[in-house]
């Protein structure tokens, strides 16, 4: 919503600046009157890139925030430093104000999906959480044609970069993947010593960290399917001999090719016990947005074992901004509930050193938060 003031006629521009000024000191009724006159609530000033919502957040007056949001203020508009009004609230210790903005984000995103009438990953609607991006980092089809590079970062850990220098998979994520595998397998009856082992589905190989961790479990997986689409990653898989490991099966292609095709779903399930679904499913794709993740949610009931199955995903959408990250996580929880899954969240601390050193030599930083919200979803008990 960062629109140039040149697009406004003089009368609207005057109203926009009046609203910006009023948001700093005026009563909520004055803000409501200006909005009723047509003042553009999305407008951001040139000095700070602040909207009326940013200025109102600085006042710590919740009613002003509510009036502005009802009048069209944009909950996730960012200033010149990438901060939403929610971060202004957080910096001032205003939990109530932050909750108002977060809840509006959840409401507007849920409304977006309800009105879009589709969850297809090919839909033209772009979720507000993620702007349109036709680079290899923002478009999965572009990414699948891009050249990848494997190297070692300044932190001494292996990483995969795309042709634009964006991190596809980076070694710093391994402690988080350890937690994912731990939460997906702990106390599962098939993961106990002497048991037959779990059936695993992983979508998106990357550096193979999560697949290696699953293979290190005792007992090892009784079945382990990996869906991967990038040609170079598939070459890497064969170079490492992953496809030769016992009970491992590689399905080449996008997950949409396999799981949105009714006939192929049966092939995917063919290796699970009695074809009744996987015991653990993990998804971590690159250059896909929330629409794609939501579409994946909707196939989970068809491929997850209903009794003890667990599902998790790389929870990285909006992870450079705490307010957007909170909205994204809440939205995912609500949409998982829509398809019959209950989510438990596990908070994992990310050390400051890990958040700084790893980004040297990487074009686009995709993480900038002190904590990670790890989701574990299970089918709801009726």
UniProtKB/Swiss-Prot annotation:
Protein family according to the UniProt entry: Belongs to the class I-like SAM-binding methyltransferase superfamily. RMT2 methyltransferase family.
Pfam families, per database record: Ank_2
Natural source organism: Cryptococcus neoformans var. neoformans serotype D (strain JEC21 / ATCC MYA-565) (Filobasidiella neoformans)
Originating gene: RMT2
Subcellular location: Cytoplasm; Nucleus
A GO CC term attached to the entry: nucleus
Top class in the EC scheme: transferase
Assembly and binders: Monomer.
Segments annotated as ANK repeats: 22-46, 48-80
Domain RMT2: 134-382
Taxonomic superkingdom: Eukaryota
Any one GO BP annotation for this protein: methylation
Keywords per UniProt: ANK repeat, Cytoplasm, Methyltransferase, Nucleus, Repeat, S-adenosyl-L-methionine, Transferase
Binding site for S-adenosyl-L-methionine: 143, 177, 205-210, 228-230, 255-256, 284
EC numbers, comma separated: 2.1.1.-
Biological function: S-adenosyl-L-methionine-dependent protein-arginine N-methyltransferase that methylates the delta-nitrogen atom of arginine residues to form N5-methylarginine (type IV) in target proteins. Monomethylates ribosomal protein L12.
InterPro entries: Ankyrin_rpt (IPR002110), Ankyrin_rpt-contain_sf (IPR036770), Arginine_N-MeTrfase_2 (IPR017408), RMT2/GAMT_Mtase (IPR051038), RMT2_dom (IPR026480), SAM-dependent_MTases_sf (IPR029063)
Protein name per its UniProtKB record: Protein arginine N-methyltransferase 2
Sample GO molecular function, one term: protein arginine N5-methyltransferase activity
